């Protein structure tokens, strides 16, 4: 019902300064509720910007010989409800992994004496039940322009991880921080585990996945739902593969998702807020998160796991009394495309992101458009039947970076002084023009005009 749709527009909030002089690939918000975002660029560096004032906080450079295509923050460590990031322990040091076209992955750490602080004390955030900080953090300020006075000296290039034969396209930490995955033009996915004692920077290759038949463009982790963390990967071979550890140290492909007619550029797992709103209160079985994908075929799709009926002679993995670590899992899962979002893009859709707060989806691509979608309830066709839902387009922004392609888009919490409510989100875009831009959402435009 179009009349019930909110009238909203995306408005430019700020450009992050200083911008890169060359192509900017992706901007990744800090997952530990710190007001920082890391932008990977083709000038061989990563710029860490402040989300509070949109200026440079620090810079990672000198570790790669070619373009840095991807960056990933290591998740923080939760202790008794607190997310502690700077208390002196190795696991609490800020860490960023970078993937480069030079075929190497780098691991960078924030030096001990220059960790984020509130005044002179450690930065410790109390995390509420909704995953948000009870008190917003503030970062040590640098120069008068808001940048870090010790730029270039505050991140240590700790270790180089080698193994790929060609350009690394994407890197990602698992939600637990246990695994670090990288994918490459060489058609492989490498999975690493940090095994050294505190501060030793020792990594071990635990798996090399070779089931894709072409360039692997992206990887995305699903958090452990009791059956282990799952890695989704998208490729130039037009397919999506799901892989997981079998409980004995071996990694295997558990599902192959087919349906796209072009390169799979981006993936994202459904957040908890969307799962809860979509699940039945009567069901005792937690639903499996859906998977979001975008492609060169100009579509954005949602995939769902199909129920697998237990066989007549139930194997041990159906016995809930046996710990999951002792039960072999089923080899294959069946996934189907259960929704295709309304068509917005005329060129490849390079990036998508599913908001963990609102459940809305944002997409962008080669046509420079940024689109926001929302899932709506349609109702039931029959009494007592299944509730039907549909995805609608809330707004489309044309030419977000002028004539340039937009390579990446992400939802991000607002930390600047202009936010109007504590849980307000903004959208960050990253483009071929070297710019990283922040956008805010203005809703109910017509209604606000009437009230004025």
Swiss-Prot record:
The keyword Repeat applies. Residues 112-153 are annotated as: Disordered. PROSITE patterns: WD_REPEATS_2 (PS50082), WD_REPEATS_REGION (PS50294). One of its GO terms (biological process) is iron-sulfur cluster assembly. WD repeats lie at residues 20-59, 63-118, 163-202, 211-253, 259-313, 344-383, 405-449. GO terms for cellular component: cytosolic [4Fe-4S] assembly targeting complex. Belongs to the WD repeat CIA1 family. Essential component of the cytosolic iron-sulfur (Fe/S) protein assembly machinery. Required for the maturation of extramitochondrial Fe/S proteins. This is Probable cytosolic iron-sulfur protein assembly protein 1. It comes from Sclerotinia sclerotiorum (strain ATCC 18683 / 1980 / Ss-1). The lineage of its organism: Eukaryota, Fungi, Dikarya, Ascomycota, Pezizomycotina. The gene is cia1.
